[in-house]
Swiss-Prot record:
Record keywords, A-Z: Ribonucleoprotein, Ribosomal protein, RNA-binding, rRNA-binding
HAMAP family membership: Ribosomal_uL4_A
GO molecular function: rRNA binding; structural constituent of ribosome
Coiled-coil annotated spans: none
Matching InterPro entries: Ribosomal_uL4, Ribosomal_uL4_dom_sf, Ribosomal_uL4_euk/arc_CS, Ribosomal_uL4_euk/arch, Ribosomall_uL4-arc
Protein origin, superkingdom: Archaea
Disulfide bonds: none
Biological source species: Methanopyrus kandleri (strain AV19 / DSM 6324 / JCM 9639 / NBRC 100938)
Protein name: Large ribosomal subunit protein uL4
Length: 260
């Protein structure tokens, strides 16, 4: 399977033989398993205060008083006297079955499964039906996957990267990501995650020589070195088919890393 190689002006200058994994079937089940495992392994343990609800001297009255035998606040002639405390059904009591920091959230994925998931996610980037299903705008994209000369990795100015996106038909997808940014629903908006930001173009290079600096300010654009490429880069949210740009050098690294 061959793909055209474009220069920074969007002109076809060469062809490259794509690695065999671009022709593999897309296994959504493996991709989802790998992405969810990666997300679970980043979770930070959390739990309640072990003493929560126990900071009281309340004691049960025992049997024979015609009331429930729950711990009750001591004292007389004040509003809290005799009020239930400590138990889960009482105001200010402990939480029933509270989360504990000892819980292990990690998930393990077999080595061959994880490798197959990455190969499958790469294959989805070459299939227009998966890229469109993710919501990417590819009307002006000449070919999938997009392969661009190695000079791409040295672009360190936002203006240069913007002109490159326009020349190869990727700018429409960047604008889609910019216009679809929205305020997050729920409490996350006040926890440093105010906006939900769509993903747009992923750039995969063999070595960063400035492209991260040039691309970082464009909405939804990510840059990753081929040696560190993961399933989550290619399938955010476990949805395969991200609009991806490869350099020939990156393809060589991936073939060496994932080849048969």
């Amino acid at each position: 399977m061959e793909a055209p190689v474009f220069n920074l002006e969007g002109e076809e200058v060469d062809t490259v033989e794509l690695p065999s994994f671009f022709e593999e079937p897309v296994r959504k089940d493996l991709i989802r398993r790998a992405v969810l495992a990666a997300q679970a392994n980043r979770r930070q343990p959390y739990g309640t205060d072990p003493r929560a609800g126990f900071r009281t001297s309340a004691e049960s009255w025992g049997a024979g008083h015609g009331v429930a035998m729950v711990p009750r606040v001591k004292g007389r002639r004040h509003p809290a006297a005799g009020r239930a405390a400590r138990v889960a059904q009482a105001v200010g009591g402990q939480k029933a079955h509270a989360p504990t920091p000892e819980k292990d959230w990690t998930q393990r994925v077999n080595r061959k499964e994880r490798r197959a998931a990455l190969r499958s996610a790469l294959a989805a980037t070459a299939k227009p039906e998966f890229v469109k299903e993710r919501g990417h705008v590819i009307d002006d994209v000449p070919h999938l996957p997009v392969v661009v000369v190695d000079e791409l990795k040295s672009l360190n100015k936002a203006r240069e990267v913007r002109e490159f996106f326009k020349s190869v038909g990727l700018w429409a997808d960047v604008e889609r990501a910019k216009s679809n940014r929205r305020i997050r629903a729920g409490k996350g908006k006040r926890r440093g995650r105010r906006y939900v930001k769509p993903k747009s173009v992923l750039i995969v290079v063999d070595e960063d020589e400035g492209i991260k600096l040039g691309a970082r300010n464009h909405p939804g654009v990510d840059v990753v070195e081929a040696m560190h490429l993961g399933v989550e880069h290619l399938a955010p949210g476990a949805h395969p088919g991200r609009l991806t740009v490869f350099t020939p050098g990156a393809l060589e690294v991936l073939e060496e890393r994932l080849g048969e």
